[in-house]
Structure formats: structure tokens, C-alpha cells
Amino acid sequence: MIYAFFLSEQPKKLRLWIIGGYLNLLRTIKLTNTYSEFLAFLMNYRGKSYSQFKQDLFVLFISKNWSQKTFMEIGVGDGIEISNTYLLESQNGWEGVLIEPNREFVDSIRKSRSARHIEAALTTRDIGEVEFFTGKRGVFASLLQTGSVSEEASYHVKSIPVSKVFGDYKRDDLSFLSLDIEGNEDEIIIELMKMDCKPFIIIVEHNYDLVKSYRIRQSLKENSYKLLLRSISEVDYWFVRSDKINLQE
């Protein structure tokens, strides 16, 4: 019954793939009270998720007893569809910053979101303007020109370095960071971990890139982050700072 509703809005093939991954998860770990509570949380929020794989509900579940509700979403898209922060902001009182360089989404973000929008591409260092490649309907866009994106256009956008974006943040100032830029997520994470800011929750896309995946995992684990529920979302990682959650596995 749980699997009948889980991601029920997704295509059947994708839904079965996700269910298979989740069954594998249940075979390899002991189902503790925490995991049972998470499943119940998903049931209560059925139909209210805007994320691709319920990432927003995971954040709400982990942060349900937190008083601080701040986010930064890097790679926002139109601000609503498959956004990891729209639900947090629109229905749960979260505040934050959005970083999205794709000019196709500027009007939509301004109309649908109250969070501050930085129209620039996040980079590891200050390099001025960068070439930005857009894919079909602008959904997939990247600083990298790769065969995985059917490029229709490219143009130059402003860049903003990690040091400038996170420079004023103290260690505990940011509750949630979402990073999905179809490119150098590993380099961004490594650079971020050199700074004082250590978000409580980090959701970062790896998109099955083995080198990128390894670099992300190593960097975050070295900084006391715990990887959770890996089999639920295969395309990205859900990390929580170890001092912000107590899971028994």
C-alpha cells in the first residue's frame, strides 16, 4: 500500500524503478522508528510535493523540530516545477536565496517566489562572465557542453563565486542547501567545505557520475555529514550534518 502512493504522479516505469530501490533499502537496513515516521510523513504529505523525488518532504521531515528555516537553492528552474524549496517557502514559512542564471526562468521566478533571486552562475572562483548552454525548454542547462544535453542555444551570463555567496554566512546560518547545476557540483561542494558555512541539510545532484559522486561523498563525510536514504533518490545525495539528526541504523 505504501508503494501504491509513493511518487504516484510519476510515470509507471520510473515509479517501479524507485519502488525497487526502496525495497532494496528495506532489505539492507533495519526499519527503525525513524524510517517508519518518514514513511508516515510521506503519506501525510501526499500530493503536496513539488520536488522530483520528494526532496522537499525529506527536508520538512528532518527539520520538523527546528526553529530556524533558511534555504539556498542553486539551480532553481522556473521556481516551482521540481523545485526543492517552493513548498518550504510557499506553505511552511521558510526564507532564502535562489541562484539561477537561465534567462528563460527570470520572469517565472519573480512572479512565483518571494526569495531573493541572484541571476548568475555559481562558480568556484571569480571569473567574470561564463558561457551558459540551454537544453530543450530550458529545463536542463549547464556551464558544460555535454552530449547529455541537447543544446539549442548558448549565451554568456554573469558568474558569482562561492566565496561571495557564502562569505557572510556563519557555520549555523543555513538550514538547507539544494545544489543542482548539471555540472560541477563536486567542485562547488569542495570549495564550500573550505568555508565557515556548514548547512544542516545538503541535497546535491550527482546524476550517476562516478567521479563526481565519489568527490562529493568524500568531501561531505570528511566534514561530518551523514548520507541518508540513498536508495530513495538515485540521482542525488541527501546529506544531513551529523549533529543535527540522530538516526539508528
Model-based region annotation:
Residues 2-249:
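Phosphate/nucleotide-binding beta-alpha loop and adjacent structural elements of enzyme active sites
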